[in-house]
Amino acid sequence: MNGGDDAATSGPPPSLEWRFSQVFGERTAGEEVQEVDIISAIEFDKSGDHLATGDRGGRVVLFERTDTKDHGGSRKDLEQTDYPVRHPEFRYKTEFQSHEPEFDYLKSLEIEEKINKIRWCQPANGALFLLSTNDKTIKYWKVQEKKIKKISEMNIDPSESSNIPPQLVTNGLPADKGHDYLSKDFSFPPGGIPSLRLPVVVTSQETNLVARCRRVYAHAHDYHINSISNSSDGETFISADDLRVNLWNLEISNQSFNIVDVKPTNMEDLTEVITSAEFHPIHCNMLAYSSSKGSIRLIDMRQSALCDSHTKLFEEPEAPGSRSFFTEIIASISDIKFSKDGRYILSRDYMTLKLWDINMDSGPVASYQVHEHLRPRLCDLYENDSIFDKFECCLSGDGLRVATGSYSNLFRVFGASQGSTEAATLEASKNPMRRQIQTPARPSRSIGSMTRVVRRGSESPGTEANGNAYDFTTKLLHMAWHPTENSIACAAANSLYMYYA
């Protein structure tokens, strides 16, 4: 996807071999998973040294990288030295309760505590900052190490009190005058007050992580919040629900600006809803949002205060004669992500990953079929509501690969560079490669000067490549790619698995 002429002459990079790195919260055989422990959001920070997860119980858990601290340098620096390159290692840092269950008495509506999204903000003065949201309320958190203060001893030794001249300790006045002056109100012992002993507070070298909520952004969404995204200006962010996108300033919690509103005058005329929204990683005036009809709109906030019109519309024309009852349901986009340079947008609908060039709105430059073999079972998936599952997607920092999840705790990794045939299936377990399949791409067809590629998966209906039946109760919805390395974090129920290549 990136690399220009050099990549074209050297060919696509070789396929990666993925290895297990770590697991947090691993389940034992037969252990029942509590609903509140299921992970619902994952996000790396920009440096890749911190990872945050949110769960359905409203908690945010932070992890920090440890392998770079051992040698005091980044992984890139270590690769240029004689140190053996170790795989990325993270450790538990802290956790805090971000959201609590609430009840909206005006609408008689329960608001669950589940964390929908987490986004990291710019760190400052050694403190970490992040945004977390549930269905209705966004919170801005500051996480900082603070030194623990302890009471060590009293300030004056009792034995020293006898050496203090009595005339100097009576209310700051000479003993004789002070006693006479206050004798009407107070009674002092003869000779004045003995020395006052106060505890001495000493700052120890021990530190404690403290999470403090700095802002609460509430009462701005009538519908469930599905997305939050930081602007590259470091000062603003957007939040999106089914019908609106709002713009916030991080420092102002009681005011937001509605920049996108797709709510019709008559709700009976509603044909699509907003499913995901994301700021451009470089240009703070541009953002994209996806819809339940499978389209992506790129808007420029400089055009007008309310962005009713889009700068570009990305949608794939429907193939003639292919429409069915499920066509519109599976076309709904569940997640979009910009590439690091902002040139491409990756989208995930129920069956496919699609890669879009923002300079070409005629169609995606590549499509990756995630679980095409489930198409004959769409009726079953509709009946058990699995067809409405919202899978996330992610891109590698170099833009050469894309990834997304599937059922049976499987996830797919595809090569995104021109000519690549990489298409791996991995399992969220300690042996990720045991179900791997490598399937060559179909012949690509040209669109103008670009190339559209379609990569297919296993074709056996309702089964995995090794013949096992798909388990629709175990699904890998949430995953994140490290910003600078080939390292993936993914959530399988309450377990966080990490892999590297």
UniProtKB/Swiss-Prot annotation:
The protein's name in its UniProt record = Serine/threonine protein phosphatase 2A 55 kDa regulatory subunit B beta isoform
Query: Is the keyword Membrane in the record?
Result: no
Question: Any idea which residues bear N-acetylmethionine here?
Answer: 1
The cellular component terms of Gene Ontology attached to this UniProt record, alphabetical and capped at eight, are: nucleus; protein phosphatase type 2A complex
| Disordered: region residues | 439-466
Superkingdom of source: Eukaryota
- Start and end residues of the WD repeats are 34-73, 110-151, 220-258, 269-309, 328-366, 471-501
> What gene name does this entry carry?
PP2AB2
| The organism of origin for this protein | Arabidopsis thaliana (Mouse-ear cress)
Q: Which SUPFAM superfamilies match?
A: WD40 repeat-like
The UniProt function text for this chain reads: The B regulatory subunit may modulate substrate selectivity and catalytic activity, and may also direct the localization of the catalytic enzyme to a particular subcellular compartment.
Q: Which family does it belong to?
A: Belongs to the phosphatase 2A regulatory subunit B family.
Q: Note whether Repeat occurs among the keywords.
A: yes
